[in-house]
Amino acid sequence: TDVPNLFTMNQICILSNGLETRLGAFNAGYEFFFEWLKNSEEDVIDRESIKDNALSIQYMADSLLNKETLIDYIENFILFENKHIKIIAKNHQYLGVNNLYNSFQRREELNGKIGVFWHTQGSGKSYSMVMFARKVNRKMHGNFTFLVVTDREDLDTQIHKNFVRTEVIGANDETQPKNSVQLRSFLQSNKQFIFTLIHKFGWDKVTNGNYPNLSTRDDIIVM
């Protein structure tokens, strides 16, 4: 209370007792602090060795606290939800989003298929999408459209809300087509974000003939 703004500019906090090292935001409870042990997806973690030799702080220093990595993290992997709740990327999100970003830079070589980013339930998939979209828009030139396709209305709503809460899109932006006709209209426009359920791509071939070409653009990113 004596220095209420002491942590206003703080980006990340690291806690360590030598045996265990965790990363988190200053306003988060300890249960939301997490390990950072991998510098790449290929790293194999020997937890017994790390614990026995008190190496967790060294792993943090060699990976996240590397100058280039830390600058990238601060620039692209910190979000604010509803202006007040700070959300920072976990180890798997940082590595996964950057793998997608690197693949996206090679999209022509990869025939437009930039990969699969697998998440377990509750591991922050919608925030990973936000971080990926923000980094692409911030670091790359282009007029990209991000098309987020889901198969459940609750999931579509959740992802859309997280994009709104982190101010990537506005609450009143028209980004969720109500039906197939509006979806096709959205895809013919230059909307930056579109959130849709997969069934809205449905088409009655008997009544309407062959499926139409929805867009000739090569800068639509499907997630």
What are these regions (language model features)?
Residues 1-2, 178-182, 205-209:
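Short alpha-helical segments and helix-capping/turn motifs at coil-helix boundaries
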Residues 1-145, 154, 158-170, 217:
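ATP-dependent helicase/translocase motor core
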Residues 15, 149, 223:
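Generic enzyme active-site microenvironment
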Residues 17-19, 152, 196-200:
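A short beta-strand-to-loop transition that corresponds to the Sensor-1 phosphate-sensing loop
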Residues 40-44, 174-178, 221:
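Short, surface-exposed, polar/charged, turn-prone segments marking secondary-structure boundaries
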Residues 91-99, 189-198:
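Conserved long hydrophobic alpha-helices within structured protein cores
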Residues 147, 153-194:
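Conserved nucleic-acid-binding Ia/Ib motif block in the N-terminal RecA-like helicase ATPase lobe
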Residues 192-223:
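Conserved RecA-like ASCE ATPase "motif II neighborhood" in helicase/translocase motors
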